[in-house]
Amino acid sequence: MIMKMITAIVNKKDAGEVCDTLSEEKITFTKISTMGGFLKAGNVTLLIGVEDDKVGFVLELIKKHCAKRMEPMPSVVNAGVPAFGYYKTEVLVGGATVFVTNVEQFEKF
């Protein structure tokens, strides 16, 4: 049996729907709370071990429930400027970053 490891990094706001859908489809996963380095926003990293022929199905489920959207993000004009130096800018968030890797060995005890 050929196995793959899907590592999916999804926005915290999308994680609930993704996890619920995976559970409904009887796809097991491990959920880890993570934080992005650029926006410092909450993410969830899902580790999903599946058979090779299920990869496409799982990727479609993730894609369906991880919408990209614009959200406001406070920015600093200058580090030396007091609080009134902040302004808001919009950044693209959501979607998913997914890695699919080969699994050399799989054991379940």
Label each region the model flagged.
Residues 1-109:
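Positively charged, small/polar-rich N-terminal and surface patches that mediate targeting and assembly
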